Amino acid sequence: MSVGEGPDTKPTARGQPAAVGRVVVLSGPSAVGKSTVVRCLRERIPNLHFSVSATTRAPRPGEVDGVDYHFIDPTRFQQLIDQGELLEWAEIHGGLHRSGTLAQPVRAAAATGVPVLIEVDLAGARAIKKTMPEAVTVFLAPPSWQDLQARLIGRGTETADVIQRRLDTARIELAAQGDFDKVVVNRRLESACAELVSLLVGTAPGSP
């Protein structure tokens, strides 16, 4: 069965197929529009399970545990690593804290037929593909290098040094897009969102 044909299935105890939710791992360079695409997907797919990352850092003002992040103490985080309960994890800011993707909520949602979306960086996507081969990795790409530069500069939220670092990282990420199962070019939000909806649930809501 191809990715666009509908939910995958697995045999139940009585031999009848049960739907298994698709797991899509989304990655892409800074300023390519990942957050906007994620918002669109959450609006289009009401039952979408969007993976909330676990982190060892302290909550910032206004952040809600379980909504923005799962805030976990360093000892517990290490236990999750040792027990293989993270699909991927990384040290942030030179080891100042750690963050990662909890395996249990993702597998539990998929097992009940719910589509799952995970947004991570390039290294995270590669790690998840190794630990969860059935996941579909998607690289969200800009229409052109010039477009990505314009988006980064146009945000007006970073210094010139930060923008240059992000562009240097983006070159590395763009060079690796061939490692992904699918590349979606974010020319127009509606089109990019529709492609991802199709990957997650088989067809875009409202389409014939």
From Swiss-Prot:
GO terms for cellular component: cytosol. One of its GO terms (molecular function) is adenylate kinase activity. It comes from the Bacteria. The modification N-acetylserine is found at S2. Its main location: cytoplasm. ATP binds at G28, P29, S30, A31, V32, G33, K34, S35. InterPro entries: GK/Ca_channel_bsu, Guanylate_kin-like_dom, Guanylate_kinase, Guanylate_kinase_CS, P-loop_NTPase. Pfam families: Guanylate_kin. The keyword Cytoplasm applies. It catalyses: GMP + ATP = GDP + ADP. CDD domains: GMPK. It is found in: Cytoplasm. Its EC number is 2.7.4.8. Residues 21-201 form the Guanylate kinase-like domain. Keywords: Acetylation, ATP-binding, Cytoplasm, Kinase, Nucleotide-binding, Transferase. Essential for recycling GMP and indirectly, cGMP. NCBIfam families: guanyl_kin (TIGR03263). Belongs to the guanylate kinase family. HAMAP family: Guanylate_kinase. This is Guanylate kinase.
